[in-house]
Amino acid sequence: MPVRTVGEYLKRWGYTPQRPLHRAYQQKPEVVQHWLDNEYPRIAQRARAENGEIQWGDETGMRSDSHAGRSYAPIGETPVRLVSGSRFSTNMISTVTNRGKLRFMLYRETLTAPVLIRFLSRLIRDAQGRKVFLILDNLRVHHSKKVSAWVGDRKEQIELFFLPAYAPELNPDEYLNCDLKHQARTGLPARNQDELERRVRSVMRRLQLRPQRIRSYFRHPRIAYAA
């Protein structure tokens, strides 16, 4: 049977070609469901009772040698894009809220406990007296003894919670990372690290001025639980 005929039958039966979602095989569906049905509702209830603010956090990186985008060219003539011969990168940690607030910090070094604590200090300061309920993934540094001790000394100001393992689709900040990379890679490639950082910072500041854009991440079916 010709492939085209198979496609016609599938279309009649209600099937369409779609890009599959990727899900780690280590993910435990029962743990995810428990988070949705029990853990997150408890966090939300506490945040309301304590006049707190729930924030979702994540880290990402931008590299000069990452390739994205396509271009048109005659058959057999691959288009050439001029890029820097040097390799450089910048890292970012950020948080979003379902009210459309966005906070971020750029850093060049590896994410260590002191770097994370520096960002957490900023979150406390920016919260203006409200307690921060911060939801993170299970990166090792998030569970480090230094971070746990630092947060433990500030229980009235900040508390950390953790998503189920291997469940990035539950984190709205992942959608921010995708948004950033899409916007930052448009136009000419950055020529050096400073230019890359300026571009990332510019995109993030524009997004800070568009709370409706941040809120739109929470309309995704996977994130609707947190809207």
What label would you give each PLM region?
Residues M1-Q27, E53, T60-M62:
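Conserved short alpha-helical interface segments
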Residues T5, E50-G52, D173-A227:
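C-terminal anion-handling pockets and recognition modules
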Residues V6, D58-T60, S94, L120, ...:
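Generic structural signal for small/hydrophobic residues in well-ordered secondary structure
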Residues R12, H34-S121, R222-Y225:
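Extended, low-complexity cationic-aromatic segments
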Residues L21, E77-S86, G152-P172, L188:
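RNase H-like polynucleotidyl transferase catalytic core
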Residues P29, D137-N138, K145, F161-R185, ...:
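RNase H-like two-metal-ion nuclease catalytic core shared by retroviral integrases
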Residues Q55-G57, V132-N138, F161-P164, F218:
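Short beta-strand segments
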Residues H67, A113-L160:
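RNase H-like DDE/DDD metal-dependent nuclease/strand-transfer catalytic core used by mobile genetic elements
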